[in-house]
Amino acid sequence: RDCLLSRGLGDVYKRQSPNPVDIVEVDAIRTLTDAGHIVIACGGGGIPVLQQNNHLKGASGVIEKDLTAGKLAEQIDADELIILTSVEKVCLNHGKEDEEELDTISVEQAKQYMDEGHFGIYNMLPKFQASVGFIEKKEGRSALITSFDTLKDALKGKTGTVIE
């Protein structure tokens, strides 16, 4: 079977995750969030499906999880996208002598950093793509990237990377 592979770390290749086009259950998710419920949805990006006539058919693969989070936030008209990861703040030149933590940056700066290749395709790049895509769809939106352990402080503006 033909599939598109991309190079991961070292000599490892992995099947590329498709980008989300739509969230099938967005109406149910929106109803629950509007009623004040905390909804956990689209875990791991979700299972891709194809619509054939009036039926959904599962497709091989796993949807890109960060882009799915951005798509869901967009479709429920959220004001802020929060992406949790393994680091407290995003860094340029991660792990190098000239490492630089990012606090608050603009969408334009985020795009520049992506264009300059600062972020890996399997770690920070999809988080930035999701954040920028979400913010650009509607004025006044922002995105926060931080770790689960620092989320409370990040929500108070004490840490994390904010994209505006």
Sequence positions of predicted segments:
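Active-site phosphate/oxyanion-binding loops
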Residues: 15-28, 33-145, 149-164
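Single conserved hydrophobic/aromatic residue that forms the stacking wall/gate
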Residues: 2-13
